[in-house]
């Protein structure tokens, strides 16, 4: 059975990640309405998915002012807009797939939870890592009791030097005053993931972090305000916009990459359009002369209600961008997992180590390790059947990770003082 979908916010998530699923699975999903503040993005998506002009809008508010246009709505706008838009969508009768975070406000999170119960609509938050073959396998191992009761988790998120510069120094999520703190916008993914994997409830949180490097005081001698404006430090600067968006082997347009991150700078990325973007737009600014205030490194410790704990570290100073490592220690053994290599090792106390190659368990590892598509398909199935899949990130479950993030930011701003949850 096909589900009709409206998408608000046609950036790298709404337009590039979720919309193409309608073409991959045309029997399951059809896009029937679109909205974005950038008319060019709306026009492009409308052509791609045959959405009539009368169902295309220049804001989420304009779309939501219409009679109900679809079974479900994908909310892929900025962090501080999510709840306002979702509340109206619930009143209209939409089921909701919402980009994380829910909101930078705990009050708004609870307001949305109450509204979802009132209107009896499904809300799923996009904690996509739950849906990857990699973390699904780890969940299976823990649930089967193979390593016993989980006592300690040590986890690292390597954001990557260029990803940090792109998204959290130059990009949309650089300033917590207009979006969210880093521990909410980026690492609520991880808080949700590890609480879910170990089936734990958080009790107390402490956290430390700061903007260590991406600030004016760290600018090298001769640094210009923009990378293309005769910067004397350009040659040896790894954060140089021309390197990241033009010449870098992984991320640069000249190396054949026309997807993320260059597709954030131009709808149809070419060398010419990307050069124009870094000469005139926000992604060409010097990383030491931006208006960013989110942390570039942070450590968060979580004590759970059963006495177990989670130690989590996030860093923007790594060469291997967007990678995660974890060691999960239980009463019978441990799990060591490297998402970059898709390798999981199980070490029981009295047996040889077992190595699991996750690439042999699935074929699609695109989009957050295969999590993006799988999450959307489970959401569509839930709407069609009315049955909630076991791993689905419902609003109720997602709020736990947000409570940890709110506590972590409060602790960080108070020099690491512990903050109670609940």
Regions from the language model: what does each represent?
Residues 1-51:
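N-terminal Rossmann-like dinucleotide-binding module
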Residues 11, 129-284, 415:
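Predominantly a Rossmann-like dinucleotide-binding segment in NAD(P)-dependent oxidoreductases
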Residues 42, 85, 112, 138, ...:
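Aromatic/hydrophobic pocket-lining residues that form π-stacking "cages" and hydrophobic walls in ligand
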Residues 51-115:
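Beta-loop-alpha module in the N-terminal Rossmann-like domain of NAD(P)-dependent dehydrogenases
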Residues 93, 120, 145, 307, ...:
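Glycine-centered short loops/turns at secondary-structure junctions
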Residues 111-128, 148-155:
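Rossmann-fold dehydrogenase core element
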């Amino acid at each position: 059975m096909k589900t009709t979908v409206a998408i608000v916010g046609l950036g790298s998530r709404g337009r590039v990640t979720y919309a193409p699923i309608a073409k991959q699975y045309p029997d399951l999903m059809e896009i029937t309405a679109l909205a974005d503040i950038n008319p060019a993005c709306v026009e492009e998506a409308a052509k791609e998915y045959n959405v009539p002009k009368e169902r295309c809008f220049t804001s989420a508010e304009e779309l939501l002012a219409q009679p109900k246009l679809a079974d479900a709505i994908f909310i892929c706008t900025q962090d501080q807009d999510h709840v306002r838009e979702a509340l109206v969508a619930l009143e209209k009768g939409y089921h909701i797939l919402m980009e994380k975070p829910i909101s930078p406000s705990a009050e708004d999170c609870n307001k949305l939870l109450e509204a979802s119960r009132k209107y009896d609509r499904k809300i799923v938050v996009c904690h996509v890592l739950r849906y990857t073959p990699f973390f699904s396998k780890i969940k299976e191992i823990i649930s089967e009791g193979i390593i016993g009761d989980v006592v300690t988790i040590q986890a690292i998120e390597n954001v990557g030097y260029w990803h940090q510069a792109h998204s959290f120094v130059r990009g949309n999520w650089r300033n917590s005053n207009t979006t969210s703190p880093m521990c909410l916008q980026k690492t609520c993914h991880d808080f949700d993931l590890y609480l879910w994997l170990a089936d734990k409830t958080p009790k107390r949180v402490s956290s430390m972090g700061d903007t260590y490097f991406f600030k004016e005081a760290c600018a090298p001698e001769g640094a210009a305000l923009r990378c293309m404006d005769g910067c004397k430090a350009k040659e040896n600067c790894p954060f140089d916009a021309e390197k990241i968006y033009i010449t870098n082997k992984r991320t640069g347009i000249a190396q054949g990459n026309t997807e993320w991150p260059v597709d954030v700078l131009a709808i149809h990325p070419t060398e010419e359009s990307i050069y124009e973007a870094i000469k005139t737009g926000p992604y060409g600014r010097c990383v030491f002369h931006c208006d960013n205030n989110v942390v570039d490194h942070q450590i968060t410790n979580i004590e759970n209600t059963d006495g177990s704990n989670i130690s989590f570290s996030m860093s923007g100073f790594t060469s291997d961008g967007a990678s995660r490592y974890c060691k999960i220690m239980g009463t019978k053994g441990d799990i060591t997992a490297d998402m970059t290599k898709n390798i999981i090792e199980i070490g029981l106390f009295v047996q040889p180590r077992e190595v699991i190659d996750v690439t042999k368990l699935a074929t699609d590892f695109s989009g957050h390790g295969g999590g993006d598509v799988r999450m959307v398909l489970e959401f569509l199935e839930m709407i069609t059947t009315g049955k909630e899949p076991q791993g689905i990130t419902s609003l109720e479950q997602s709020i736990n990770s947000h409570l940890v993030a709110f506590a972590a930011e409060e602790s960080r701003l108070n020099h690491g003082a512990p903050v109670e949850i609940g």
